[in-house]
UniProtKB/Swiss-Prot annotation:
BP GO annotations: virion assembly
Start and end residues of each stretch annotated as Interaction with large tegument protein: 489-965
Assembly mode: Interacts (via C-terminus) with the large tegument protein/LTP (via N-terminus).
Functional note: Plays an essential role in cytoplasmic secondary envelopment during viral egress. Interacts with the capsid via the large tegument protein/LTP and participates in its transport to the host trans-Golgi network (TGN) where secondary envelopment occurs. Modulates tegumentation and capsid accumulation at the viral assembly complex.
Primary residence: virion
Domain of life: Viruses
Species for this entry: Equine herpesvirus 2 (strain 86/87) (EHV-2)
UniProt-recorded name of the protein: Inner tegument protein
Listed GO CC annotations: host cell Golgi apparatus; host cell nucleus; viral tegument
Compartmental location: Virion tegument; Host cytoplasm; Host nucleus; Host Golgi apparatus, Host trans-Golgi network
Length: 965
């Protein structure tokens, strides 16, 4: 609809209406298809609309003519996506101002009425209150807490709710003015993190970052004087895929310095941001959520060489802060059942002060979801508990910010916040059946949906009651207000009161004759004949007939129940059904006796069907996950059941149970797309992980062989002799090639787990949506109107999704516990620095008996005290050896991996070693060994000690000294 012509079109449709019924039908449609507010800025258009309402015998039309401001603004909308953007708020206020001016300029002004001059809904009162409200909106400072609510006379106006919601939304989405903790001046890393966070908050407030120059200077200092803070990708076993936060943090620092990295090197070759003992010791726990790259590394078992006690002390400080933060949140949110702005402001300020923004909640949630199971959490003290509290707070924070964006004292927020609460509850329940450690329930300790009730606005019952009472001149208008309050606020009070029309004992809606007019002049037979001759769309009736005490039961028997049965059995098409339902609501709407209690649920059913048919099927998002109350379909069942029951009370002998064919078809049309989408997601997940899992199994098996194989180290050539084949054979692998292969295998497994976890996250959203529909179905299954819920079979869909999630968890658990997951740790000796450095070797080569002593060397040499029993290498086949397939796979991983050599081939050439004898010139006896007898050596300490160093033998030392360099 063209916004500028919408009121013109409405006036034209009213002019074309041939009778009262058709006029009212046009007006009732505004309840579900609102009018554009922009078209109310012209008094000429408003006057043209009022001129079409010339039927002076109807109370509803008279109400509209006398109170056009209330009526038109009640059904007017800004016509834009709500909430309005912050930049559109002043334009929206301008539209309201133009509408007020247009109503004030109406010539002639609306007719006077017998109502008191101070009637709440009078034009003058509405326009005065609206002008005051506009002035208040213009004076608002959105950086300060907002507490305003619409005035009593404006609470039911759609456009007022929309602009109220938009102003509150603008306040909540702007960062609060908070005092950030002072960063530790001794830590350049923390100063950078804190300043960059403060700059981001300033940019969000449309302010230039105050510390831009200091940030640039800090970045240069970090890159020049703190180079060891950055870990090259070639050093760590993780990659930018498994450490994306560390990579992104490093990129942010490099980007502050012009030409820090040429071309696209920043994306490919930049290091990751690490940390050192000094950084962890200086870290302030108040900034725990700015250190996401630290937690990311710890969860991937990467400590960058930091001392264990340093890491654990850092975790202990963070844990204490998180416990205190959680206690504050619980205190602020417990025992609150309705909207509590002060508590919301306090929690928001506390979150922003420690860096827990909406983006940080999503960052931590994703990081914790893709973190490998087990690993460091079982080795580092306090890490498991800290991760539990991080998960608990960030899960709550994610839903907190979702509610915050929807928070206001309006029915719009009431509906949206309830959806978030239901989604939070479903998501919380969806994690328990399949995730690891579900029994511990880290994020399940808080009743998140209960704490979020601080966002749920309370219905303004007193204001609604005043509005309802002020509309007493038209029972039909009161009925529409009661219906809208029921629909918007889920409040039954005024919906029930609207059934009790004055003077009719609940059986009339005004008119001149109440419930008994014409009863003495019209027989039941005449009323029955009239009702049996009615067809949908008829508008003519005799007043004495519709006001007869026989009209309601005869109309219900001959018209209402047959029409309802035809609709509910699905015998009429959609547009025909809506037409007939609307006719049942509006036929003799203010004159007929005894039908009010039936027409009101039919009115709600009509609006609900219009909404459902307008939206089409629901997908797997929030709509599907929403609710334990049955959602839109549950409301529809309630309305039809109420109308059918009321009609049966008039005609006890007619009809049976409520037909369900239409409602079952609506259920299927609503949820069939979701079922297809969820099954497609499961199929896509299995298709995606199948090649990954196959490759993962093979890599894990090869890694197991490498871990359990026995190696010979050829020190002269720097090769590892790796067993190969069932027959005694081997592959001589250069140590650098072997190390690179091991690193690639481990990082590939970690990357595969990240990809699987990301796919699992998507699947879990579908699983949560499926649980939401099943939760809704539990309500529908207990409803008096019994639907056929067998198709789609969401129980089968749930089992399919759950099977996929369990399969992922099984794969992830096995992978995390495999040799491949920690392959570099198993071969840690290869990655350690050499025990004898180049400087020591030079001292050995340049040794002078007159100048130097050999104490340091002799102390490291011990006489072997035992012989290690071993199987003969030449004769016995190795228990763990690579096969041809393994070798092919290893060469695909690292093309430098060499080909095998069968036993008996020429070994690598080595330089003959020259055995030297030690003299007693330093008063040390010569060590003599039979090297033919002692094929291998081992060192057994007298006391149990833990050493990260490898021992050397005399033979190896001789080879190192006399070999080629």
């Amino acid at each position: 609809m063209n916004p500028q012509a919408s009121l013109d079109r409405l006036a034209q449709r009213l002019s074309d209406a041939e009778n009262l019924f058709k006029k009212v039908r046009v007006l009732v449609d505004l309840e579900s298809a609102p009018l554009s507010l922009r078209s109310l800025s012209d008094p000429v258009r408003i006057a043209s609309f009022l001129n079409t309402l010339s039927d002076r015998g109807n109370e509803y039309l008279a109400f509209i003519r006398h109170r056009p401001a209330f009526y038109l603004l009640r059904v007017a909308s800004f016509g834009e996506q709500v909430p309005l953007g912050a930049g559109d708020l002043q334009g929206a206020v301008g539209l309201l101002t133009s509408a007020v001016r247009a109503f004030k300029d109406l010539k002639p002004p609306p007719e006077g009425t017998p109502a008191p001059a101070n009637n709440l809904l009078e034009n003058s009162n509405i326009l005065t209150r609206l002008s005051q409200f506009i002035a208040h909106l213009r004076s608002l400072d959105l950086s300060q807490p907002v507490t305003f609510t619409p005035p009593a006379s404006l609470v039911t106006l759609r456009c007022i709710e929309e602009i109220t919601f938009s102003f509150w939304h603008a306040h909540w989405t702007a960062p609060p003015e908070v005092s950030l903790p002072k960063p530790n001046p001794q830590s350049k890393l923390e100063r950078w993190l804190a300043l960059s966070y403060a700059a981001a908050l300033g940019a969000a407030r449309d302010n230039a970052p105050k510390h831009r120059r200091e940030l640039r200077a800090l970045a240069k200092s970090l890159l020049t004087t703190e180079r060891d803070l950055f870990a090259p990708v070639s050093v760590v076993t993780e990659t930018s895929l498994t450490l994306p936060l560390a990579k992104e943090r490093a990129r942010e620092i490099f980007s502050m310095v012009d030409d820090a990295l040429p071309g696209d090197a920043a994306a490919r070759g930049a290091p990751v941001l690490g940390f050192r003992d000094a950084d962890l010791n200086a870290a302030s726990p108040e900034y725990v959520f700015l250190y996401e790259h630290v937690f990311e590394a710890l969860l991937h078992d990467q400590t960058y060489g930091c001392a264990r006690r340093t890491v654990e002390a850092f975790l202990e400080r963070c844990l204490k802060f998180l416990v205190n933060l959680g206690s504050y949140v619980q205190t602020a949110c417990s025992n609150k059942s309705h909207l509590s702005p002060p508590e919301i402001e306090g929690v928001r300020a506390a979150f922003h002060a420690c860096g827990l923004t909406r983006e940080a909640c999503h960052t931590f949630s994703t990081m914790l979801a893709i973190a490998p199971a087990g690993g460091a959490a079982s080795r580092l003290k306090h890490l498991h508990a800290t991760v539990q509290h991080l998960e608990q707070i960030t899960v709550f924070g994610r839903h907190f910010y979702e509610c915050l964006r929807r928070c206001s004292p309006t029915s719009i927020s009431h509906r949206l916040v309830r959806e978030v609460l239901r989604t939070a509850q479903v998501e919380q329940n969806s994690a328990t059946p399949w995730t690891a450690g579900a029994a511990e329930g880290s994020a399940l300790g808080w009743p998140v949906h209960s704490y979020l009730r601080i966002f749920l606005p309370r219905p303004p019952e007193d204001d609604l009651a005043a509005t309802f009472k002020a509309a007493s001149e038209s029972n039909f208008m009161k009925s529409l207000i009661g219906v809208s309050v029921k629909r918007d606020w889920d409040l039954n009070k005024f919906y029930v009161l609207s059934k009790k029309a004055p003077g009719g004992g609940g059986n009339g809606e005004g008119g001149s004759g109440g419930g008994n007019g014409g009863a003495g002049t019209v027989s039941r037979k005449q009323v029955r004949k009239f009702c049996e001759g009615l067809n949908p769309g008829d508008a003519d009736y005799a007043l004495e007939v519709v006001q007869s005490k026989y009209f309601a039961p005869e109309f219900a028997r001959a018209v209402l129940l047959p029409e309802l049965e035809a609709m509910l059995r699905g015998r009429v098409r959609r547009h025909v059904m809506l037409f007939r339902l609307r006719w049942l609501v509006l036929f003799a709407f203010e004159d007929a006796a005894g039908l009010a209690h039936i027409r009101r649920p039919l009115t709600l059913a009509y609006f609900q069907l219009t909404e459902i048919f307008g939206q089409g099927g629901v997908g797997s998002g929030a709509g599907a996950a929403g609710g334990g109350d049955g959602g839109a379909l549950g409301n529809l069942l309630d309305h039809f059941h109420e109308a059918w029951t009321a009609a049966r009370e008039l005609v006890p002998e007619a009809g049976g149970e409520v037909p369900h064919e239409l409602l079952t078809n609506i259920y299927r049309s609503l949820h069939a797309p979701a079922a297809r989408e969820q099954l497609a997601a499961a199929a896509a997940f299995l298709k995606e992980i199948k090649p990954l899992v196959e490759g993962t199994w093979n890599m894990m098996r090869i890694a197991s062989v490498l871990c359990h194989a026995r190696y010979n180290y050829l020190s002269a050539s720097g090769h590892l002799r790796v067993p190969f084949g069932e027959k005694p054979g081997y592959v001589d692998v250069p140590v650098p090639v072997f190390k690179e292969t091991v690193k690639i295998m481990e990082s590939s497994l970690h990357e595969t787990l990240v990809i699987l976890s990301q796919a699992c996250q998507d699947l879990q959203r579908f699983y949560a949506a499926c649980l939401g529909i099943l939760d809704q179905n539990q309500f529908l299954a207990t409803h008096p109107v019994q639907l056929d819920l067998s198709e789609p079979d969401f129980q089968a869909v749930k089992e399919t999704l759950l099977g996929c999630l369990r399969r992922y968890r099984e794969v992830a658990s096995l992978a995390a516990g495999s040799c491949c997951f920690s392959l570099t740790r198993h071969f840690g000796a290869l990655f350690d620095p050499p025990l004898i450095t180049e400087a020591v070797v030079r001292k050995v080569l340049e040794f002078s008996e007159e100048r130097d002593t050999t104490d340091a060397f002799i102390e490291s040499l011990q006489q072997p005290i035992a012989k290690v029993e071993e199987e003969d290498w030449d004769d016995a086949p190795p228990k763990h050896a690579l096969n041809d397939y393994d070798l092919t796979a290893l060469r695909e991983i690292n093309e430098s991996f060499p080909l095998p050599k069968q036993h008996g081939n020429n070994p690598p050439e080595t330089t003959p070693s020259i055995k030297l004898s030690y003299t007693d010139s330093v008063n040390v006896s010569q060590i003599t060994l039979d090297w033919e007898k002692f094929l291998r050596t081992s060192y057994i300490p007298q006391d149990a000690i833990t050493s990260e160093f490898s021992h050397i033998t005399v033979k190896k030392l001789e080879q190192s000294i006399t070999g080629s360099f």
